[in-house]
Amino acid sequence: MRIGINPNRHALATGYKPYVASAVVHLPNFEGYHEHRFEVVKTSLTTMRENAGLDCDILIWDNGSCQEFRDWLLDEYKPDGAVLGPNVGLTSARAGLLRIVPPNTIIGLADDDMYYYPSWFKASVELMRQFPNVGQVSGWPVRTQMRWGNKTTLDWARRYAVLEEGKFIPEQWDRDFCTSIGREWDFHVHYTKGDMDKRITYQGKQAYAVAHHCQFICKAENLVEILRQNKEAMSDDKVLDNAVDGAGYLRLTTIDRYTRHIGNVLDAELKAPARRRH
């Protein structure tokens, strides 16, 4: 039986700041692949908050992690918001995060093994505002990401900006990428020998024509609308990249490296305070 209509049925989410940094975490145990990941995840979440460079809320979606991690998350880290539940997968978790915050929120979405340098969020927001019709901005320049999901960005750049192709990303960043995913350097050099960085200059501002799906910021309502029109958009990383591109949005990455992938073991250099990006 029901009498009347719930007055909050169509109410929008409130209570969050205009900027929200979020991550999806899955740390079920400390065995095998996950043996050293507690340190990785703690470093990721800590640098995400401490190095944002602007006032933002922290929202964590926990996908079935162990109790020890959840105790640390709630008792020590203390995010502004947290969703704790069974492992529903990255796709469902990210879609859920987008719907938790108000539509006009600029939200950062990330995996739980990213490292953040000072002012990562601030720099991404500034880039988003300097270019028109931006769908995503990442702080992690990766050459191989420029193979797909950027047709709209490249077409726009050829018409309204200056587009350059070359090897602009520093070799050390490329080596760091290989280390984080366990790829041999010599193989990587051969595998990517035909790949070029695609750099855009627009009104004096520069960006790469790509946005990495492991870490990016976006306006929540834009991705929610894409998901409404294409229910498969979050089903896979490349599918998401292509869906945002297909919706007519620019996908950009900062020229400086503001974020990077850690992997499942924290390297010695990342244990020091995050003071530099190079």
Task: Give residue spans per PLM region.
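Conserved donor nucleotide-binding strand/loop of the catalytic core
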Residues: L73-V88
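Short beta-strand-to-loop acidic/aromatic patch adjacent to the donor-nucleotide binding site
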Residues: N104-Y115
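N-proximal low-complexity "stem/linker" segments adjacent to membrane-targeting elements
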Residues: M1-T47
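C-terminal catalytic/acceptor-binding lobe
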Residues: M1-N6, L12-K17, D186-H278
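Conserved catalytic core of nucleotide-sugar-dependent glycosyltransferases
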Residues: F121-A220
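Acidic helix N-cap motif at the loop->helix transition within catalytic regions
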Residues: Y33, C66-D75
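Active-site nucleotide-sugar/metal-binding loop of Leloir-type enzymes
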Residues: A95-I106
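A conserved acidic beta->alpha catalytic loop
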Residues: G53-L54, L59-R70
